[in-house]
């Protein structure tokens, strides 16, 4: 009797150990992202602060994970070298920020450090997830013929997180407590989240992971779940969010999934999967009906911007301005010699003059902020003519609030310098570029899941260049990291020919 009890206790202890694994904790970090986002929004608005509880909660699991890796694996020197590199860069960057900051700066040293910490954790999380989901358990899973088991946890974690996101969004809409995507004009709805652009990007990138779960290998309950969530997400993104990314992005994701599925069947001379085509068409039709009945906040936003464009007047030319009203006033002061260099440096003043002249010459819309910001920062780099700033950046928060870069890829290069660009952005770009190389070389054995994940990664890079709110958002980065891990795993499957090794009958969704 006692032996049986001791056996049962051992089994229970093993089960508990299996539950509290690093892989499960990392999946939990993905699942709680929507809860952390909502808590951040409520905390910041209630206490009117830039900090929140989630600022301190998010790093806990990654710190535990990196500590585990440091003491359990034989890569201590590499971790120490990487830590020194990122710390050294941060010190140089903050020092430059401190030296060049003027009165017009939108943030102080603490805010700048906050961005550096977020980006460092972003790269650290990428390493952690690759280590646990693409390296550590791989040999064991191959031996046990369970390759991809831990990765399935990541995909299901993304599905659960997406479900929570859309559930919270509709709850905010039903209770009429949703905030507006564009608060100044009360257009679009973003629920209890900080940014409409970021919540839209999170949902779109999640769909790149979730939609391939419609294949026959998953249980019927999972497929129904995915279908319902996709329709709800599509209805929200296309009718209620109010951003072009949401409206056109959803159509791109669904069409990409249909295209990859059809392409596979054509390449492998299989019958077209009519169910997939039917599901895709149904999703697009349902969303189209929703847009027709309820209208689209995106279209409303475009009309509002067009009206706003005609309202901004340039008193120096007596015509509609091609820059913002604030920029017109700043340029007037600069031309009149009334701008204090303690408020705005000489190089910034010249960059504003160049921006004003270029915008008028090219007839740029005064509401096209991203183009105006790109012109300003390009001119500022030329005017500063500084090697240290070129290498370590001229600061993200050191500019007048209108010129804080929304386009993240150029921001990495201009505001964080060439070294910052390599430290924070290049790791993701390498994965994306190598994924393209593998697909072009071995496209006949590429799974639809791989094609979708790689498309999602490139979609994130393109969106971060065009609209922003991608790499600068902690929760969005978790989905990008999940996409990266899927891509790496799929590449390893192809390179090692493991599809046949661990399951020769599997692979009915390859391109």
Question: PLM features: residue spans?
Answer:
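N-terminal signal-anchor transmembrane segment
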Residues: 2-71, 89-102
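Interfacial loop-to-transmembrane-helix boundary motif in multi-pass membrane proteins
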Residues: 26, 82-86, 129-170, 219, ...
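Long extracytoplasmic/lumenal interhelical loops at the membrane interface
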Residues: 190, 343-419, 439
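A membrane-periplasm/extracellular boundary helix in multi-pass inner-membrane enzymes
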Residues: 261-357, 382-384
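Alpha-helical transmembrane segments of multi-pass inner-membrane proteins
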Residues: 151-179, 196-265
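Transmembrane alpha-helices of multi-pass inner-membrane enzymes
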Residues: 27, 254, 453-464, 470-511
